[in-house]
């Protein structure tokens, strides 16, 4: 393979074909079904599907096939089946649904407003992970352009990842013959510790998502006449959350949500911290003098990757401060996001959470806990020698730096599904979500130079597949 020719192809293809497509993609508010209950009627998902379909048809490799599956009541699935000229089966994964808008975007930016600034493309979903479909095809075409042989490649793009991938088990069964048995899974939906090297993700946390609703009255009443006698729904919610979490330390109290961290993952984390140093703290946009939960860099990374953690990500029943009258509110509803470590059974974890929140409720208040489908975490199998060599070779070629691996605190449900179904498969979990790229938050950006180099690395690794 001519590395320089590949780089020229990738750079040109990104500028001419991928960046313009991502501009159009970012404009479409294709929120995942969890954040848009009327997604079908609103039509944004179909608009993105048609954009992707039209683009793929234009750039489809010879003898390849574009397949779209759309079962009743399910989000669509887009597949690009590229026949191989050498043995092997590679599955390349990404998604085209998005997180909601989130507040706090800079004045000149917005979730549905694509803006290119300092070689970074701002807007929701470009980095997480709308680029994956386009970059995957770019990598394959770069190899074909040089007449190089590739194994069979299936590009697999879902539309409900940000909702926990509830439709994937259905499509995994429906498309089992098409998927076959992957030898290598390439996922472009993960992170990067910096923009200086090729990063691989070796583990992901799982997720228990649920809402906690506490009701004490049928309607709000004057707080002057009721407070102190009628219990506060917010205080009860606080009490219930304290069953899950030590509010002094943030430690999760429920044993079913913990696991023993393998020594090799601890060693891997120490190497990660040695590579990045204080950047593992500085990557976050701290307010004023706010401090992390621990001064130990290694322990801090383990807390966000291999330990459970609770986040309250939304609330109902609380009026905006400027419109808050002196009313004892009838209810408080909190949306909870509980990250669980790899190797924790998500169903057992969810049952333990529901039990803790529901048993013996204070004052016999009405407490309702509603859960989404729990998602399992994932820990990578041992990397084969050929893949380890290919990854490091690619990083040295296109970044002039050794590759590095890390655990991630986010969740990609499909990886756990694939790991369970295909235990002999090898995995490359990587992505462009580096420092300050802020997926899910305001000012999300795609680092274009890094994305180009990552695309080259993926092509190089595919070329070295054996």
Task: Show the residue positions of the predicted features.
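N-terminal helical capping/dimerization or prosegment-like subdomains
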Residues: 2-104, 331, 348
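Active-site metal-coordination/substrate-binding segment of hydrolases
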Residues: 87-157, 453
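Acidic, glycine-rich active-site loops and adjacent beta-strand->loop/helix elements
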Residues: 96-98, 120, 156-165, 188-193, ...
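Acidic/histidine-rich catalytic neighborhood of metal-dependent amide-processing enzymes
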Residues: 127-203
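Acidic-enriched catalytic cores of C-N bond-cleaving enzymes acting on peptides and small amides
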Residues: 178, 193, 202, 209, ...
């Amino acid at each position: 393979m001519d590395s320089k020719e590949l780089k020229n192809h990738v750079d040109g293809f990104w500028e001419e074909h991928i960046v313009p497509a991502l501009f159009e993609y970012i404009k479409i508010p294709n929120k995942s079904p969890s954040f848009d209950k009327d997604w079908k009627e609103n039509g944004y998902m179909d608009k993105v599907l048609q954009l992707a379909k039209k683009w793929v048809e234009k750039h489809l490799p010879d003898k390849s096939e574009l397949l779209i599956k759309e079962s009743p009541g399910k989000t669509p699935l887009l597949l690009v089946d590229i026949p191989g000229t050498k043995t092997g089966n590679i599955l390349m994964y990404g998604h085209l649904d998005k997180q909601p808008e989130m507040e706090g975007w800079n004045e000149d930016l917005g979730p549905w407003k694509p803006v290119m600034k300092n070689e970074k493309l701002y807007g929701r979903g470009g980095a997480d992970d709308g680029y994956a479909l386009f970059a995957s095809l770019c990598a394959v075409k770069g190899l074909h352009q040089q007449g190089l042989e590739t194994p069979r490649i299936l590009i697999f793009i879902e539309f409900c990842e940000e909702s926990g991938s509830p439709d994937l088990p259905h499509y995994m069964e429906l498309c089992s013959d098409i998927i076959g048995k992957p030898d290598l899974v390439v996922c472009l939906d993960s992170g990067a510790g910096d923009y200086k090297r090729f990063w691989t993700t070796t583990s992901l946390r799982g997720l228990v998502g649920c809402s906690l609703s506490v009701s004490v009255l049928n309607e709000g009443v004057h707080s002057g006449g009721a407070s102190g006698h009628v219990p506060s729904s917010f205080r009860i919610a606080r009490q219930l959350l304290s069953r899950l979490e030590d509010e002094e330390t943030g430690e999760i109290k429920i044993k079913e949500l913990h696991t023993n961290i393998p020594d090799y993952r601890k060693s891997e984390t120490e190497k990660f911290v040695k590579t990045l140093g204080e950047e593992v703290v500085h990557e976050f946009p701290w307010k004023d003098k706010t401090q992390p939960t621990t001064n130990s860099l290694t322990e801090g990374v383990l807390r966000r990757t291999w330990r459970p953690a609770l986040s309250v990500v939304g609330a109902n029943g609380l009026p905006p401060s400027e419109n808050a009258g002196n009313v004892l509110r009838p209810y408080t509803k909190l949306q909870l996001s509980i990250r669980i470590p790899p190797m924790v059974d998500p169903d057992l974890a969810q049952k333990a959470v529901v039990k803790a929140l529901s048993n013996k409720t204070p004052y016999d208040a009405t407490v309702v806990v509603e859960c989404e489908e729990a998602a399992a975490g994932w820990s990578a199998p041992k990397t084969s020698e050929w893949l380890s060599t290919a990854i490091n070779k690619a990083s040295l070629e296109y970044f002039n730096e050794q590759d590095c691996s890390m655990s991630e605190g986010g969740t990609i449900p499909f990886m756990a599904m694939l790991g369970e179904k295909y235990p002999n498969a090898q995995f490359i979990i990587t992505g462009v979500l580096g420092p300050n790229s802020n997926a899910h938050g305001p000012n999300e950006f795609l680092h274009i130079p890094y994305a180009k180099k990552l695309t080259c690395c993926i092509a190089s690794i595919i070329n070295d597949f054996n």
